[in-house]
């Protein structure tokens, strides 16, 4: 089996990621490619963020949910190294054709990738 087939087979289904008529090419790519990869990488993403949080907030476990939420928002919006790490752990699972599409739409897709990851981390706040 070649790399492309393997990468695509690894991706879980995301029932909420609908493909409907009239959606943009970027939104279709997000739903067909990005969301399944993020779902596949979920445990890795949460572990990565947990390590990040504990590195910056030694008392992470005792912080209020409000302070944790603020830290998550702040980290995913302003910490360029963290954002680049998240983006890298997603685009590493792209096929060459998907990577070419990504490079053509890099700015918008980076924004969407980080936004989806931020929402996923916020929804798993109690697991971190």
Where are these predicted regions, by residue range?
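N-terminal leader/targeting peptides and immediately adjacent processing regions
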Residues: 1-35
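Short, well-structured hydrophobic secondary-structure segments
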Residues: 31-59
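Long, highly charged low-complexity segments enriched in Glu/Asp and Lys/Arg with interspersed Ser/Thr
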Residues: 105-128
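Amphipathic protein-protein interaction modules
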Residues: 60-110
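Short, flexible segments with low predicted structural confidence
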Residues: 9, 16-20, 56-57, 61-62, ...
